[in-house]
Amino acid sequence: MSTSEQTNRSELLDRPPRVQNLRQHTVALLRRLGLLPVVDELRLWLKVMKNRERNKKFAALFPTETFPPARLCNGAYARVDYENYYEGGRRSAEALLELMSGHIEAKGARILEWGCGPARIVRHLARLGKDSGMEVFGTDYDRATLEWCKSAIPGVTFTMNGLQPPLPFPDGFFDVIYSSSVFTHLSEAMHYAWLKENLRVVKRAGLVIFTTAGDSDRYKLLPAEIRLYEAGELVVRTVPLEGSPRYAAFQSPAFVRHKLLPSVPDGELIRHETRLQLASVQEIWVVKKR
């Protein structure tokens, strides 16, 4: 984890409770009034203006690289920051390889990022695995994102997926399937359906790696939501369409361990990680297929 990431993590966790509650109550009010889309458009414009020169300078350092349009970048990562997108994606790809180490032979491995967005991680994974003959795939349910990925990112096979299973692959097709902040935008029913589907498309002894908005994201919750969270229930904010950035799900470790994982008898939890990062401060879970 970089120094700036450590600082950001500390700042998030150390915010005064009154400040946290005020912000979350404001967001909840805007959600009820249907004003979040307007606010999001304004925030997007402000992010573009704020980072325009910085992004221009960073892109000049990598003249052969293509960076995603601001709307795609913001929709997937809530940022319009090329350095965060590119360098953060590289670190996440390296973290993913560390999570695989000791379980999956990289040589010739077939790996899928489910919900790849504009290729923040998968573009680097394709490069890191090129010499070992790794086959890299990405799926997403946003058509504009997939079209951009296909036109801009070499070395990765991109395919559409739906909001609901199945994935367009046969049983046991992949050695690893991973997702970064995808379950965090799904209903409880889709948690169970998609984890089962993830395990379907990996080989026996293959890995399913996913992230959740757990204890480090607890500060975002309102008092009533905290009670659900602490009771081991999934907390879901459902006003926007499922799968959209503002459709938010928060998963306590108790929910994952005692409700989600027991729903897949062919999956075995082998690692719960809070040090490495695939999606900011989200917790990482590594499940091995029996």
Language model features by range: what are they?
Residues 109, 173, 205-206:
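Surface-exposed loop/turn positions
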Residues 165-177:
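A short acidic, Gly/Pro-enriched loop at the edge of an enzyme's catalytic core
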Residues 176-189:
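A short SAM/SAH-binding and catalytic strip from SAM-dependent methyltransferases
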